[in-house]
Amino acid sequence: VSALRRALAAALVAAVALPAAAYLLPIPAILRRVAERRAAQGLATLEVTGTVQASGASADALLEAGGIRAAGGVAALPARLTLKIPGRCRLELLPVGASEAERPWLLVRDDAVSGSDRLASDPAFVALARATCTLLARPLDPEAKDKPWAAALAKRGVPLSNESLGRFDGRVAWVIGGRATDTTPLAWFDKDTFQPVRLLFTEGKLAADVRLLGWGSPTGGDWAPRAIELHTGGALQIRFTTEKATANPRLPDAIF
């Protein structure tokens, strides 16, 4: 019996350690697969409507815009996320009864940030928008598919010389930049689907952990995740929940 127990224990240890010991694709190969997966969606623009929730200092921005405070001090407000590829992402709050000109907004255009004072000065909202743009609004380079992704990750401080495997949201993921337990800049991609699922980086003095959850959901499909979360200090600070995603809507250039 003791021998059987030892064998079972050894098998369990091997199963847990398997991701660390598995074959690792070269980073350029991973990024090429990521680029191909996103390019297969055929997206030039994307509109995602839903609800944004925030706690702490970020909740004040929602309350000032007409949001409601729920249990635990969390504020909530309808919102819209629009993307124009390459490199333009806009988060817009949608208070009831507010005209288009009155709606608070935040725009990330390449590395530039602009928008309403309250949102543009909040590093957590900026980090959420910047990570979304980094992971969902990359251009396609047919000649070198990995290059736009490598450049975007390098801008966020992710080392392109180290990689590992880790587990995220119940699935195995490629971890670019180091080990899964590191708190330095890392980019995570689902091992099987090659969808982006997590980005750790620094926005100003804020250590941001942005998570893209629930790919393939009825609300977002393969175009957008079910939710985008911003964690700081191990706690959830902002969450955008997708209610509807629309591929390639006609969006005015003026909003970007």
Give each language-model segment a name.
Residues A3-L4, P139, L251-P252:
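Short, solvent-exposed coil/turn linker segments
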Residues A21-A120, P159-S161:
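N-terminal mature ectodomain segment of secretory-pathway/periplasmic proteins
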Residues Y23-R32, Q41-G42, V108-T184, T202-E203, ...:
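Flexible, processing/modification-adjacent segments and terminal tails
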Residues A57-T82, L91, D117-P142, A151, ...:
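Subset-of-secretome marker
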Residues V1-A11:
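Bacterial N-terminal signal peptides that target proteins for export
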Residues G97-S99, L165-F256:
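Gly/Pro-enriched, hydrophobic low-complexity segments
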